[in-house]
């Protein structure tokens, strides 16, 4: 009898039922990054490009808005290379600074002191512990010639500030 039942189950192909059901969801970021003021380089001498206003430059201002306290950190870097430029045959030395320029709440007054640096100092990381808006200035100076003060070739130069919200 057992052999007959086994034989019938093999012939009839007993199968099990299976269903796979997806569960979908979307998460909307509660942190946004916007350019509040576009930056541009002034050229105070042949070998320097700078965003400093005293040299006819404009420091870019980045605004980061978060509606959820302590859920994000801001990660902002001044440029360390040109994204487009004439051909450069020598070294460009980059310096810069990222700083809190303005906040929507006095509770954010400790952001600069609480920040840390990475990427050789070019990147500054800010824990966003208070919901609201924070404006960051991102100064940048490019010096051509590796200390030899060589003139930049004529042409158009572009460098990119990187700013992002990172979920914690």
Q: What are the residue ranges of the model-derived segments?
A:
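N-terminal small/polar-rich segments of proteins
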Residues: 18-93, 97, 124-168
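Terminal beta-strand-rich extracellular "head" domains
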Residues: 91-123
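Terminal low-complexity, poorly structured segments
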Residues: 2-8, 48, 119-124
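Gram-negative bacterial Sec-dependent N-terminal signal peptides
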Residues: 1-19
């Amino acid at each position: 009898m057992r052999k007959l039942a086994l034989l019938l189950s093999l012939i009839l192909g007993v199968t099990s039922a299976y269903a796979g059901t997806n569960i979908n969801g979307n998460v909307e970021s509660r942190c946004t990054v916007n350019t509040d003021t576009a930056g541009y380089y002034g050229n105070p001498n042949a070998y320097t490009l700078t965003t400093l206003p005293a040299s006819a430059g404009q420091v870019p201002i980045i605004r980061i808005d978060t509606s959820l306290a302590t859920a994000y950190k801001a990660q902002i870097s001044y440029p360390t290379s040109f994204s487009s430029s004439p051909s450069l045959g020598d070294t460009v030395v980059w310096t810069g600074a990222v700083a809190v320029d303005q906040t929507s709440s006095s509770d954010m007054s400790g952001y600069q002191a609480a920040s840390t640096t990475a990427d050789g100092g070019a990147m500054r990381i800010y824990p966003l512990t208070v919901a609201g808006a924070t404006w960051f200035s991102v100064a940048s100076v490019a010096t051509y010639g590796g200390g030899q003060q060589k003139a930049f070739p004529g042409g158009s130069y572009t460098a990119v500030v990187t700013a992002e919200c990172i979920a914690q």
